[in-house]
Amino acid sequence: MKVAKFGGTSMADANSFQRVATLIGENPDARVIAVSAGGTSEEYKEKITDLLIDFKNGESLGISRLKAINEIERRLIELESRLKIRLNILDELLKIGRKLPNDLPSDFLLSRGEYFYAKAFSEFLSLPFVDSKEIIKFKGGVLNYGFTEFLIREKYREVGRFITGGFYGSDENGEIKTFPRGGGDITGAILAKALNAESYENYTDVDGVYPFSPKMIKRYAERTAKIVKPLQKISFDAMLRLCDFSVPVVHSSAVEILKGTGIPIVVKNTFDRFKSGTFVSENCETEDFCFAAESCEKIKTVLKNGRWNRTRAELSIAENSGKTFENALFAYMPNGELTEEILREISRDTPLDFKTETDEGEVVATDKSRAENVKKEIFDMFILLSRRCHKRML
């Protein structure tokens, strides 16, 4: 059996529901499905969770709380109409809307997106809905792994295939507790581990794990789509290193939960089911790759705190803006063989002076007047080097 998790964009609207239903219909081994709250799409520009945050903080932010609740209601009614299903959750939403946000526990309020969308999707698929608060248990503010795994196994034996919401559970008093933002990935990993799944399939809106952050994929979409391909395979260790820099599309805690279990993670695109995605496994030989990170400050922090204490080649190139480093390029090679080549290419093709700090693997552009050119030249260099790395994989 497999566990599948579908993110916010996969749940955004009626078209997305139908697309995911097709994927699940073609994948009978996916026995447990965790879903996120509705995300953005061409039709909807706001995430459901963000609307709930607006409701909670509306008055202080100058936003109408009623407007936020009305928008959530509109989207749920649209699901009802277009999917021809009957939702019994609108009354629950209206009860929330009639209360003052301070009367509602924050975790409870923020978890309602996953709760509503999991119930709606279970109704659409005619599969049992399992409230995550029944199977994901916290104690003393942290996850109670042993009890949680017991409850998940018992529930699976009882109902078989089911739908549940990601991101939340409950504590020993029955109060709703949430994971960090993006915690739906964590829920999926917990389910996969508890059920000793064949694999954990994490569906998102990109073709797999790219060697740079999803934000950069969208920002440089035209160039990256034509040149840089997602990684076909990557080890858990390398994936965790990418997680340090907010590069992958899977939460780092989800990766840590499954590391050492023998359960691989498969990152796939909901919107292109013919793409193979990225296979994250324990003992695979990680391909050579380089990757770009959003912030060099994050690189410095990780290298200093000792988490990345490996005999690896580390190199970063960044614009020094005076306060923060932006558009950093960070290259990671398992065997270090490309380091000299990268340095040579950069010094030859980029008309800047560089300062090398070998203890942190940092190379900083010193000519601040060329900041915009630095951004473009560094990213172009990243594209060039990524293409070379991928050629070596093929």
Where are these regions (language model features)?
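N-terminal cationic-hydrophobic initiation segments that often serve targeting/anchoring roles
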Residues: 24-28, 259, 347
